[in-house]
Amino acid sequence: MGSGGESDAGGGASAAAGEGGSASSAVDARLARLIARARAADGHPPFSDGALAELATGAREVVWLDDVAAAVRTVSDASSASVTEAEFVVDPDARRHGHGRAMLHRLLVDAPGDLLLWSHGAHPGARRLAASHGLEPVRELLHLRGEVPSGAEFAWKTHAAGEPLATLANSVHGAVDALLAVNARAFAEHPEQGRLTRAEFDALAAEPWFDPEDVLLAWDGDRLAGFCWLKVEGGGSGEFYVVGVDPDYQGQGWGRRLVEAGMARLASRGICEADLYVEADNAPALRLYREFGFREDSIDIQYRWRSDPGH
């Protein structure tokens, strides 16, 4: 059970985000080995980039169980009734021996209030484990994949004011702060993405995959209207990591232009396939991405355990 990123045409596409599961500076060798083993066995990372970025800033901690299971959970005040967010993974060679059940039990016992957990891929075993402990599904996140049109079919787009899209690499001082401000406004009601901090952004920017040329910025004069943040790790595939449009500019085609520009950037890098994450109930975003040829690949489910079932 783990956490992932999401995607929204008006609000954004995200994995902080995210779903990358790359080993940040906060990941020690033991955890990095477990992440690699789980990813090889499952086809997807066990932890989201957002969780690992929070681990780097001290907002999350690692909990181990017998060296075969690890959880990355938020650090909370034991005296408060705050919601604990966690995701955990069991070593592929140690599964079906009760380690997942034991880890979930520990997380439930330790949680001062409610507990939120993600299940990647909606595995039947995770469904049964969640149901047996009284966890209920509260969110669904779709993982979409699509082909990147060839460079001949896409040109770099300009936004409504006629100015070309910039990148983080060639933008003015303060562009990161502007991006974070738009991100917070675009994802104001988003449980993870909207709270992205500068420290967490810096942790993600320190990852080997980060390229400031892959962060596309749409300016309206001196105001940032939206951005498209891409993630390319190699292998011929790229991710629409975050697509965010300021609420004042939503509904005006900015999201579409940013996705078009993202496709053009990926094509220029020789990328032939793209993926992203989107909330299952985000109808506008789903319509937009399906128009670009994206189709559902898998689904993640978030479960919630309520410390007070009556509320």
Role assignments for model-derived ranges:
Residues M1-A17, D77-E85, D91-P164, Q302-Y303:
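Acyl-donor-binding surface of acyltransferase catalytic domains
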Residues M1-A53, F154-G194:
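Short amphipathic alpha-helix that is part of the acyltransferase structural core
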Residues G21-S25, I35-A111, L116-G121, A225-S237:
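Conserved donor-binding loop and adjoining core beta-sheet/short helix segment
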Residues V90, V243-V245, V278:
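Hydrophobic adenine-recognition pocket in adenosine-nucleotide-binding enzymes
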Residues R96-V109, V245, G251-S268, R287-E291:
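Conserved acetyl-CoA-binding loop-helix of GNAT-fold acetyltransferases
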Residues H133-A152, E260, A264, R269-H311:
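Active-site/acyl-donor-binding loops of N-acyltransferases
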Residues E192-E200, A206-L230:
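Phosphate-binding active sites in nucleotide-utilizing proteins
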